[in-house]
Amino acid sequence: IVLRVNSPGGSALASDIIWRETELIKVSGKPFYVSMGDYAASGGYYIACNADRIYANPNTITGSIGVFGVIPNLKEFLDQKIGITFDRYETNPHADALSLFKPLDTLERSAMNTMIAQIYNEFTTKVASGRRMLQSEVDSIARGRVWSGEDALEIGLVDELGDLNACVAAAAQKAGLTEYRRVDLPEMVDPLEKLIKDLEGNRSKTILSLVLGEDFNAYRGAYDWINMEGPQARLPFIMQLR
């Protein structure tokens, strides 16, 4: 099995669920190779680190082994931009600990930091196991640091520099296959169908941007943060190419 990873990361929970599936692949005895695309960062590397061999391009954004959590405080945004205010009634002092409409207090911040530290420890433990390194060695190149594919090769985060075809050929050789055909999953979406869906999505965004005007970007950013579930293992920035 060759897993193609082209991801800046995402939910720590989702990354761990996918990692477990890679562990089941290894238990089955099948060769498990990973080919990295433009990036395999944070959660993207989390799901790759368990592979028998990892291939990357020289410029693949690799690593960013780290975790962060964000609970946005939208109180002022909703009050000043949209005119929505909230009144809270609680059954205990921390019943609304994850509320988006107030800042975190000292105890809530401490609990959040503890949870993030636990997830980071689990992350580095898995990388150390998959890459046959000491956890202290992983920590020395982790903590959110980003590496190129070439640098990642030197520090042991990847095994080879090569594209997807090179990775597939190596996996086939490892499996003892002289003749094989590649099956890509999931199946490619029909281009016309994808175009129609994209146009429908763009229409909704266009209407919303006309209604909100200059507040649209702020709304879209708030919407993205609200929909993040739990601690995140992802790049600590968003790249926009213009």
Regions found by a protein language model. Name each.
Residues 55-59, 72-82, 107-111, 178-187:
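Short, structured secondary-structure boundary patches
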Residues 27-29, 41-42, 62, 81-84, ...:
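Extracytoplasmic
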Residues 35, 89-91, 183-187:
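Conserved beta-strand termini and adjacent loop/short-helix elements that scaffold enzyme active sites
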Residues 68, 126-130, 159-201:
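C-terminal long alpha-helix characteristic of the crotonase
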Residues 2, 75-155, 159-171, 175:
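Charged, glycine-interspersed solvent-exposed loop segments at helix/strand-loop junctions
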Residues 12-17, 151-154, 194-199:
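Short glycine/threonine-rich loop-to-helix capping motif typified by GTGT followed
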Residues 115, 186-242:
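Intrinsic disorder and flexible/low-complexity segments
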Residues 1-77:
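Cleft-lining beta-strand/loop regions that shape enzyme active-site pockets
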